[in-house]
Amino acid sequence: MKHTHAQLNLDSLKLGKAQKKKEDNLMKQLRSSMQLLRNCLFQNEECKMAALKAHLVPVLHSLWPWFLTDNSSMQIALHLLCVYTANYPTGCASLCWASGGQSSLPSARSSAGNSLMHSILKLASQLSNDNSPIQQVVFCLLSNLALSHDCKSIIQKSNFLQNFLSLSLPKGGHKNPSSVSTLWLKLLLNISFGEDGQQMMMKINGFLDQIVEMCEYKHKSSQHLALLILHNICFSPTNKPKILANDKAIAVLSACLESDSCAVQRIGAASLWALLHNYQKAKVTLKNPSIRRRIDEAYSLVKKTNTQPEDELHAYYLKCLENIVQLLD
């Protein structure tokens, strides 16, 4: 791949049809190399470490201008990065280094916006409502990277998440989200697994209202993702006052207790328990008669339900409701 990059740069200085054909052949060769490397890296940490030491990220970064002119090569490069970063935090962090991943020293971290991570965010911003194959892969890659503290920090500083607010949400009773919405929800869910991500999202003006609206989707998979994000942000002490001040958010969470879906019931109960935990002011909001009625009815119903002792999810739901009732009493 390094050799191909050098050849591409040398040959780009020449003109003519023969030169164009040679360039096409080099790009074809590059695509084959990336596909082969992707297969070698799949679920293989030893190979990923070897790729890190061989400076895979700086090589891809140097080839980035060529990828931008060729969608097929860009898609394969992004697929390669998806495989490389999956369950490999060191690999994720290497995308943030200004040197292109050749050093793990903090001084090499990128602050000037010249890392591969910045280039990926720029590409994703340009495609934010596109729903092309490249957009799907770039969001898949960002979902991997969002689990890394270093990458999350660059996402925050880049203001990339502001693009979430420009999503056009479907109107009307039977709401079905666009596939772009689902890509965003999967990314945001991964960001919400850490408290830094939970706070980062709540700093975006209008974020909570948008997520709450997406919790009302009829499409079960997307609704579930949105509810999980809302559930996760309830665990941050900094976020609790804002969530409790949002009547619609509390209405959505309490309505979960009346859902036909056991998974949705659990999300609602766990979220309400999280809001109450170590936060006295939450009691005032959750003692609202209509919310309290839903809690008491759900608790009464779950105590009557006969389940197997090994049903851990049911036991967790019961524990959530027991703690909510105890804290409110």
What is the predicted role of each segment?
Residues 53-59, 99-101, 159-163, 206:
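Amphipathic alpha-helical scaffolding segments
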Residues 10-13, 21-42, 49, 53-54, ...:
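Alpha-helical solenoid repeats of the armadillo/HEAT superfamily
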Residues 45-46, 62, 196, 209, ...:
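Positions in alpha-helical segments
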Residues 59-61, 87-90, 151:
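Long all-alpha helical scaffold domains
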Residues 1-4, 9, 14-18, 37, ...:
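Buried hydrophobic core positions in alpha-solenoid tandem helical repeats
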Residues 1, 48-49:
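Alpha-helical solenoid scaffolds in large eukaryotic transport, assembly, and signaling factors
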